[in-house]
Amino acid sequence: MSFCAFSRYRTKVALNCLLRRQITTKRRNMSKHSIKTVWKENNTFSTNIDGHNIVIDLGEDQGGQDQGPRPKQLMLAAAAGCTGLDVISMLRKMRVEVEHFDIKVDAELTEEHPLKYKTMKLIYEFKGDDLPEKKIERAVKLSFENYCGVLAMYKSCVPVSYEIKINED
């Protein structure tokens, strides 16, 4: 191998190595989340997540100003949003068109402090013409058992169940 060919080879190897390092660094950054929550006044906090502002507060009956949802309710919304994104994405890939899709989350709190959820149930509600039950059941089951990271965290410490309703009123 001539010196020029060897030099080109070393340059190519170095570039590939650098590119791999950049991709690995990018992956590492994507696997970490960081947020900042700022106290505004009284019991009101503000959190900015990727440019989306969320106000967190207590109800007036709890000494707050009711300017935003409560933290535990946001946890339920995160669970519903996570599994909902999974399910609707899988249904699209399965070429299933739904007209309406809701997820209701019922969770029961403990009676003693710290108040935490002791059970959780997700109710997936679908509406549409000629919806294929098997595909819907498969999408929900895959999200519930394999893909939704928020539900995986919940299931590690709380019994979580689900129900599917198709074209029910």
Spans of features found by a protein language model:
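Extended beta-strand/beta-hairpin segments
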Residues: 23-77, 88-169
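Short glycine/serine/threonine-rich phosphate/pyrophosphate-binding segments
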Residues: 85
